[in-house]
């Protein structure tokens, strides 16, 4: 039986956070997210600590290596392992990147896709296969990029087409929208507004690195910047409050600093909820 989805503000779980999160009775986030590839088969002390957290908090999985946009056959053994992991730990949902990461071997990076009708059809077919194997919906994420491949579609139209063709949900990564808007010169606000509200499952927030004035790199290694916070508020205004998760992969600060960012997410969610009530004639 599929469990209820998550709500509120979440945090990406990294191994360095196991001890701090498990040290006290109070965990100030509403859910956690992990890459299943990093935890499948982990036992011993780390495995016990991980299990303790999955028994205390709702969890999501965010995959790294399914290669949804690639041409190589889907890794069915990996898919079956992910399915077992999801069932073992009561994971609420599974998401993957709209990218390619393998071609006659693992590329160890998330490569951009051509925004073409052919890519839409290929990716949608692979998404449907994944959903059939996992026996649950798949959530796909818009990715950051630093080069464009030839294609007749704009990124926003490509993402929308995949969602409709595959009949799947979206993990809207707000920082990735900002990074790509800066790198390729499109309107981040219009992109977010154009996403279909009924398809948006949850959101990601993260920091990035600036390589000069014209290039931004999605690193997950810095605090969220003010323009990305503003885009999150815009996303809530367009689509309503959604569960939102903070990613931080390296340069990890004390847990209190990460909590400050997840608290800020909650505050924006609260304001969004109040604005929605006012629009319906409640409150002042």
Swiss-Prot record:
InterPro entries: MbnB/TglH/ChrH (IPR007801), Xyl_isomerase-like_sf (IPR036237). SUPFAM superfamilies: Xylose isomerase-like. Pfam families: MbnB_TglH_ChrH. Belongs to the UPF0276 family. NCBIfam families: PRK05409.1 (NF003818). This is UPF0276 protein PA14_21580. It comes from Pseudomonas aeruginosa (strain UCBPP-PA14).
